[in-house]
Curated annotation (Swiss-Prot):
UniProt organism field: Rhizobium etli (strain CIAT 652)
Localization: Cytoplasm
EC identifiers of the protein: 4.3.2.1
Class in the EC hierarchy, top level: lyase
Catalytic activity: 2-(N(omega)-L-arginino)succinate = fumarate + L-arginine
Associated pathway: Amino-acid biosynthesis; L-arginine biosynthesis; L-arginine from L-ornithine and carbamoyl phosphate: step 3/3
Annotated protein name in UniProt: Argininosuccinate lyase
Listed GO CC annotations: cytosol
Length: 467
């Protein structure tokens, strides 16, 4: 699919009737979008076929011209897909490139295709179709990522690890429970994707430049043919806004944020200092100078791509924020942001799905870490509330003294002699040691949504039924 700049005067054949001369070379360069909007060729052709079919059905063009147009458009589709189509920058965009080639193939009948249509509603349609398809693809990819986490959660429903706050040891949890946290996050992301598909499921074609058209078109017919629920209801809004693209970018940014947090954890967990997980060779790289290195580059690149996605969201919001209704050429700058973010998001989800499925979990290292840092201190406080009848604030204070004592002795809470604990509070008995193991700690957290293995398995079953 080569690009050419050599076809002189072709740039104004579609719209240049009132112009005495062609545009300056710099104007051609800044005005051209074919370098990136050629990605919309399939959507543009699909929309044109639906439009031509409707025009013929309504008696606006002849059936003979419609057949020529459809045959010509299918020929162009084959040319582009096979790499035998030469794109021209002087023809500005994908719409003009296809229409010019159609005129070469079928002659004057090509000029009837643009009846009751503007490039304003045409590009709104193409872009909306592309974003809709991308959202559907994202939904499927998120479903795959959720499935990968469900498998790991089931495998590790009882594997104890430290839970963190402030990246400091907080309480024991299970790795399965930690995995299910990401199932919830990516599940919400997928829900946002589904809602976005509902929001954009309206056909723009037929809005024309901004005011609609005087031709007796059937917008419901084209909407149905293109797989939309219904046509848009306001022609000015139809060509004015790109909130469907911004919503896609916002979803991509939120999803990217979740991916980035996970990537950060994988980077930390894979360090020798943590040693919780080991990435497979398939998702790691080495060093050109240090032979021993195995770097988590896939995770780091997922983390970085989130920055690109965030930048795309801010860019499009900034482009749109000051535009009066209806269409302005500023909106030509909408597509590159979305195309780039979509590519980054696809790569990030695919890479993360592979890492989650392939990584090796060091359960022994996780369990050992879970028992350090006085992670069962809350369990001691809860025991004092239940068994000694202390108010929680008093129990919290007593436990704090026990932690300070254990820290001064260089031991864990469970290693403190009973006499030492009773010196802090006389109602402590030897039964307290039953709650100071990490296994007992996680098993006790049976509240809805808690980390107890039994509760984790309930949540896995809930999500498997919905994934």
């Amino acid at each position: 699919m080569a690009e050419s700049n050599t076809d002189s005067k072709s740039s104004n054949q579609m719209w240049g009737g009132r112009f005495a001369s062609g545009p300056d070379a710099i104007m051609e360069e800044i005005n051209a979008s074919i370098g990136f909007d050629k990605k919309l060729f399939a959507q543009d052709i699909r929309g044109s076929i639906a439009h031509a079919t409707m025009l013929a059905h309504q008696g606006i063009i002849s059936a003979e011209d419609k057949d020529k147009i459809v045959h010509g458009l299918n020929t162009i589709l084959s040319e582009i897909e096979s790499g035998n189509f030469e794109f021209s920058r002087r023809l500005e965009d994908i719409h003009m490139n296809i229409e010019a080639r159609l005129a070469t193939l079928i002659g004057p009948a090509a000029g009837r295709l643009h009846t009751a249509r503007s490039r304003n509603d045409q590009v709104a349609l193409d872009f909306r179709l592309w974003v809709k398809e991308e959202l559907e693809k994202t939904e499927k990819m998120l479903t795959g990522l959720i499935a990968a986490f469900l498998d790991r959660a089931e495998e590790h429903a009882e594997s104890v690890m430290p839970g963190f706050t402030h990246l400091q040891t907080a309480q024991p949890v299970t790795f399965g429970h930690h995995c299910m946290a990401y199932v919830e996050m990516f599940g919400r992301d997928r829900s946002r994707v589904r809602h976005a598909i509902e929001h954009l499921d309206e056909s723009p074609i037929g809005a024309a430049a901004l005011a609609g058209t005087g031709y007796p078109i059937d917008r419901h017919m084209t909407a149905k043919a293109l797989g939309f629920r219904e046509p848009t209801r306001n022609s000015i809004d139809t060509v004015s806004d790109r909130d469907f693209a911004i919503e896609f970018l916002a979803i991509a940014a939120i999803t990217g944020m979740h991916l980035s947090r996970l990537a950060e954890e994988i980077v930390i967990w894979s360090t020798p200092q943590f040693g919780f997980v080991r990435l497979s060779d398939a998702f790691s790289t080495g060093s050109s100078i240090m032979p021993q290195k195995k770097n988590p580059d896939a995770a780091e690149l997922v983390r970085a791509k989130t920055g690109r996605i965030n930048g795309s969201l801010i860019a499009l919001l900034t482009i749109m924020k000051g535009l009066p209704l209806a269409y302005s050429k500023d909106m030509q700058e909408d597509k590159e942001q979305v195309f780039d973010a979509a590519e980054s998001l696809e790569l990030a989800i695919a890479a993360m799905t592979g890492m989650v499925r392939d990584m090796t979990v060091n359960t022994a290292r996780m369990k050992a870490a879970a028992g350090s840092g006085f992670s069962t201190a809350t369990d001691l406080a809860d025991w004092l509330v239940r068994e000694a009848g202390l108010p929680f604030r008093d129990a919290h204070h007593v436990t704090g003294r026990a932690v300070a004592l254990a820290e001064s002795k260089g031991c864990d809470l469970a290693e403190l002699p009973l006499a030492d604990l009773q010196a802090i509070h006389p109602d402590i008995t030897d039964k307290v040691y039953d709650v100071l193991t990490v296994e007992a700690s996680v098993a006790s957290r049976k509240s809805f949504g808690g980390t107890a293995p039994s509760e984790v398995r309930k949540q896995i079953a809930f999500w498997r039924a919905r994934n």
